[in-house]
Amino acid sequence: MRIEEDLKLGFKDVLIRPKRSTLKSRSDVELERQFTFKHSGQSWSGVPIIAANMDTVGTFSMASALASFDILTAVHKHYSVEEWQAFINNSSADVLKHVMVSTGTSDADFEKTKQILDLNPALNFVCIDVANGYSEHFVQFVAKAREAWPTKTICAGNVVTGEMCEELILSGADIVKVGIGPGSVCTTRVKTGVGYPQLSAVIECADAAHGLGGMIVSDGGCTTPGDVAKAFGGGADFVMLGGMLAGHEESGGRIVEENGEKFMLFYGMSSESAMKRHVGGVAEYRAAEGKTVKLPLRGPVENTARDILGGLRSACTYVGASRLKELTKRTTFIRVLEQENRIFNNL
């Protein structure tokens, strides 16, 4: 047993210090990034925000809606090959270039993903997603995927420490997904005691990944556009959002009605709700590590997307970053004990 004495920080523990700026307007800020990925060699340009691969967020409808904002969607792994074919038949190449194909690590997952990728060459992203990215089996699967799809851009996770981030990049991942336990409907930290404050995880993993020419996506922990800005400020190349994009018309959650008011169910992918839906229930050897919440319907996702992008542009103007790429270089975090004046929050 050992104890690390260094303080680890989440988004709630810091604010970004403002700096002098020559920008005249938020409209002067360029949010689009251009990347060339280490292993695939593929180039991509767009706004580096990703809708999470949850079946109540990462839907085909979400992908179509967010593509118009140049935002990516990691489509959840529970669609059939036939459903993928129908989506591809009704989608433009511009939409498909904003789509990630999600997969688990079983042999069946691998074969299904292979079939999906064969449907259309415009599908360039694979998102290999497990709750615990520290297993040797997972590392071996990433290497297997890289060998099978040498020109596809592979995103793999989740991990929270630099050495495992390096391991995944060396095994073939272009982008490493960072985050264990910070999600709004994730209960891993309270069920297992395992986790890592998200901002510190992002800072440490970004440093490790960038040293090898890889990239990271901060996955989880964002509750406001300001948190998205902090993730980019901490060095994230991409930011993945779940709860912030849940509850919309495109989110795909089941709608329930209580006392005449409609709500949409949103649940973690290791929750009892998810396991009942996809694998018949919670196995006797494990515990559910997610919860289910009822969200008031939030309308079309375009309004939320505009709010997030607007907040991000504003953050850049406060520190004098004319491009999103510059935000991390212009960011100085200050530790704080409060984030906002909450006097009217309950009204």
Swiss-Prot record:
The keyword Nucleotidyltransferase does not apply. It is an enzyme of class 1 (oxidoreductase). GO terms for cellular component: cytosol; GMP reductase complex. CDD domains: IMPDH (cd00381). Homotetramer. Belongs to the IMPDH/GMPR family. GuaC type 1 subfamily. PANTHER family: GMP REDUCTASE. This is GMP reductase.
